[in-house]
Amino acid sequence: MTMAKKIYFNNPQRLTQLIGANTTVIVAGRRTGKTDSIAAPFALRNMQRMPGSTGGIVVPTFKHGLTNTLPGLLAAWKRWGYIHGVHYVVGRRPPKSFARPIIEPNDYEHVISFYNGSCAVIISQDRPGSSNSLTLSWLLVDEAKFIDYQKLKDETLPANGGIKSHFGRHSFNHSIMILSDMPQTQKGSWFLHYRDKMDPELIATIEGTVYEIWRTKERIRSLSSKRQPVPDYLKGYLRRLDRNLNQMRSVAVYYKEYSSIENLQLLGENYIKQMKRDLTPLTFQTSILCQRIGIAKDGFYSSMRE
């Protein structure tokens, strides 16, 4: 019998996964595990549960994607038992044993291909037209403060139309995740407005529904372990909860800001002290503490001068 492997997630990482909003924007300090434990589960879930789909990973440059984003994703997947060359391949045509994507890429050079036919295309803004002709079912936008929003809006967001006939029932079809630390310029602040789009009551209802599903499953497990019959009404109640959760997630926007201190258990106090010592006050406040400082139109912080 295979033993389940326990995986540690901090509170921001757990909440992001449990809420599972169709649009998720996480603004968090350095070393909070944005790529490793927020982006990696998001991409893996989409590729596993929408077999044959195509997703997009938007990065400022291919160099950034290949040296920062991609290694973080692959390292997390490896820890969770997904092996490069067995469960997925990168940058080459997948083996014949893999299922084929619903829409096959023209070129596999910047593509992650999964065994079930899902693939993720690395979309770099330093190469014009890298979103052209794509039909995407999800988008991951990494290092969003360096992303040109006009290019994203004109070239990439329209591609996130997905294939409704295959994946329309999933709340995460057309989903988008945006990750960054706190920007220091007006141009890099394009994603902060998502805070105003979030409905706190809807998010609270999702949290309550997730808990109620867990509580109901525990009750069913308890009855089964005692070899007692599980009432039909309880099974029906669980199905209704799942349907309601799926509907709420499909329209939800989740926006959160976190400082690096949220990951203190792994980072340790010395890391925070070292960053305070080594970074400029402005960079420490934005990149570690994730604090918003008023940004003037010229791109400089209006309430602070270094």
Regions found by a protein language model. Give the residues of each.
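Catalytic P-loop NTPase motifs of RecA-like helicase/translocase cores
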Residues: T32-G33, G65, S131, I147-Q150, ...
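Signature of the SF2 helicase/ATPase Hel1-core->accessory helical subdomain module
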Residues: V141-S250, E257-S260
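Conserved nucleotide-binding/hydrolysis micro-motifs of P-loop NTPases
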Residues: F62-H64, R127, M182-Q186, E262-Q265
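ATPase catalytic-site recognition across NTP-hydrolyzing enzymes
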Residues: S225-R239, Q247-V251, E257-E306
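Inter-Walker segment of RecA-like/P-loop motor cores
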Residues: L66-T135
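Pre-Walker A adenine-sensing motif
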Residues: T2-A21
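Conserved P-loop
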Residues: T24-R93
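Alpha-helical scaffold elements adjacent to nucleotide-binding pockets in ATP/GTP-utilizing enzyme cores
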Residues: P41, N68-A76, K151-A159, W190-Y194, ...
